[in-house]
Amino acid sequence: MQRDYLIRVETESMLDFKRLNGLMIGFVIKGEAHIYDENNMTQCNSGDIFIINHRDLYRFQLQQDGIICYIQFQMKYLADKFDDVHCLYFHLTDATTTKNIHQLRNIMARLVSTHIRHNELSKLTEQQLVIQLLMHMIHYVPRTYHSNQSILNDDKVNQVCDYIELHFHEDLSLSELSEYVGWSESHLSKKFAESLGVGFQHFLNTTRIEHAKLDLTYTDETITDIALQNGFSSAASFARTFKHFTHQTPKQYRGDRPAITENQQSAQHNYHDRELILLLNDYIEEMNHFIEDIEKVNYKEITFQPTNHQLNQFNHIIQVGYLRNLLNTQYQSQLLTCHSDFQVNEVLAYDVMPYIMKKLNAPFTYDAEISNIFYDIDLCLDFLLDHNFSLTMHLNQYDSRDYIDAFKVFIHHVALHVSHRKDLKFNLYVTTLHNSLIEMIDYFKALFPNGGLYVHLDQATERHLPLLKRLEPHIDHFVFDANSNDAVDFNKMNDDEFKTASQMIINKTNYLIDLMHRHHLKRPLILLNWNTLTGDTFITNGEYFRGGIIIEQLLKLSSKVEGIGYWLNYDLHVSHCKNERDYMNSIELFHQYNGKRPVYFTALLFNKLTSNILYSDDTCIVTGTDSNFQILLYDAKHFNPYLALDNQMNMRATEMIHLNINALEEGIYKIKHFTLDKENGALFNLWRKHHTIHGMDKDSIDYVNRMSFPKLEVYDIDVTDTLALNIKMITNGIHLIEVKRYPSS
């Protein structure tokens, strides 16, 4: 219930002191706040925690743009949770370690953020986090016993006040309370007035009215119900007492505070919910949960139905920059790993003609009898031939005679080098069209009749349509680029803009398909340079986990695009970029030290799907047969990547999916469950934790690479008719479940 605890965000100062009934803990979200008690003032800056104990006088004074948040526990709630509430007097001291302070702030930030977001299961998640917060305080924040913290003149009067706070909803009397402390009624009444300046009945009614105000503000309960549950004998008695203390009737008081909901109460002043979430992100850190923070439950029933649709796997094209990079043994190993895991068989290299022209025009002459100007190129070709990779070369600035001559020398040499071995699958890729290309392609096709020509396709290509038509018989594929980051302004928080960006890749694909149709061009497409929303910095690109978004794009593209491009690794990729924004145009498979990025595992998991589709919807696809099938579930949420700048982003949501696969043949099934999400397989978090100003040593590198893998669970399950699976889906996560029935014995 709301009356058990309050979760608030405050942007305005308190004018007067209040005496707290209960326990309050909070921290400064932004700016500076002065926390006053009866005798002292404590200056708190951003991130500082404050605690106010039961019966303390307190007041907040917020400096300009200051924001604080707090959780206030009612005494009755604490009494229900703890055997002895007198032990709940907390004090932050040097004994409270920085780690524990961070953890307290972490829990509170998540709690306030959950409260603001107000999702389907926010109330349950709040209650879990509240318990976690109290447990952490009990274990890690120093406490003193109540008897050392008396704020009144007499301990017995203090006991009576505590008793009233815990039992105000009951039928209390002065005689009952005097018996409780062993005094006469007259003596208790006298001591009460001396200590508090008010009589017993006045104090009791004040306590009841304060609790009733909370119910009037935050619940829809009837006034009669509120009266009875706060200790009044009737609605009429409640109304009289309420008006005496507030000069308003309960109905008038409630009417002055319309439409205050649990999620609105935290968003005060001129701060939007999302701004508060973004500010709270700075205080949320990764932590091991002993409480599940499930925010949504989804039930999915699947029965396989025959379909005419097939899932097409992609031809993966890996960019390596300069051809000589293939001499690097680490890069060779990475390519072979890709080839083994998801059938990579094509390498795209930059133009070698400038390199050859430089050698051909050198001031000294290479003697063919004692040297070979193509020595390093031949070693690269041998690696490709040995491992059945095809080579695609990006030609650039090929409109000069010197370039064409160098091209012919190079192509002739390659043809001679591979003539005594199996054929090399050789392709040329051009991004601009020039008439000199006709001569070059004719020469190339004469020596490599099975060679391919890739042509970049965009709006500008239409200006060269006649030349494109002449080249069409030689063209194998059209190539294009698409970057969702180009569609948004990351300084804005407009959700509609990010929704538009989520469709950018598929929209451009459809546009090009329509362009080809209008001009009667029929060739398969290759998406070479592409990216989903990542932000425009290296940090957002790493922190914003987007595995599910990438899977979503691959599924949408599988029937429209034949090839998908990636850079091999971070070092090769970044060395060919002008700036961070340019870097965001593409995705690489490896980080440094052979660390596999999540996109690597996304491609690996996608490759485990087979062609026959048994079921599909917006977040799930099942392929295979009824006895050997693959279930792919994913979450794809597109939002501003800057909201993900935290190890455990505040836009993170957790969904429990109860999945039933119906009408299966009875038997024992083997389950292999891969989980790729922010907590399983995300390289960037581990990398940053183990990276020092001097880099990483071998132990750290090996550990990070071992731990940065999808989670794998393997088990057998006996199925009669329905296979039931429970899947915890984190924002933008992926679950690939392979199911195979054992043969009958």
From Swiss-Prot:
PROSITE patterns: HTH_ARAC_FAMILY_2
Domain HTH araC/xylS-type: start-end pairs: 158-256
Molecular-function GO terms, alphabetical: DNA-binding transcription factor activity; sequence-specific DNA binding
Keywords recorded for this protein, A-Z: DNA-binding, Repeat, Transcription, Transcription regulation
InterPro entries (alphabetical): Glycoside_hydrolase_SF (IPR017853), Homeodomain-like_sf (IPR009057), HTH-like (IPR037923), HTH_AraC (IPR018060), Tscrpt_reg_AraC-type_HTH (IPR020449)
Transmembrane segment boundaries: none
DNA-binding region boundaries: 175-196, 223-246
Pfam families the record matches: HTH_18 (PF12833)
Protein name as annotated: Uncharacterized HTH-type transcriptional regulator SAR0107
Source organism: Staphylococcus aureus (strain MRSA252)
